[in-house]
Amino acid sequence: QYTDETVQNNSLVVECGERSRFIGYDDIYVQEANMYSYSYSTSFDGEGAITSAIDYVTTEDLPQLYVLEGHGEKDLPENFKEQIEKENIETNTLSLLNVDAIPEEADVILIYEPSSDLSEEEVDMLYQYAEDGGKLLVMAGPTQDGTLENLYGLLENYGVETCEGIVVEAVSYTHLTL
């Protein structure tokens, strides 16, 4: 009734009205592997998980994140998706090729590592969305053909400049893996 996940001992269900959120034991006690020392560390995140669940079941209008598709975008990493869910943000996909306008309920448009450039029409729609107060989150890297000219042109309107280069973390065990 509450979840499709496998229910374990010491798991919780938070319910209010028509909404419910299942909190698995693994969400309360989080285990992380350290590949350098071949050890595991366990931390308690019960407060965060329960607070998030209460917020979810009591909030009527959850923020809407639209993930752009249609340009060979990569899938969002699992830990990124989990964090979005924990923050009670609903995700949807959006192809600007099939719509005349960006949905009004879109709080944020996420552009995640496109492998091909956006069309001028798509950039115009995103520009109008941003000018009307919409939020854009762009995560782009190198592409096969080497350029995202239209996308980067959109970002330049807001003071974002791109340059070629490589970012290197000198201490390899302190980086975040996405």
Show where each model-derived region lies.
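Short, surface-exposed patches at the edges or C-terminal ends of soluble domains, predominantly
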Residues: 1-176
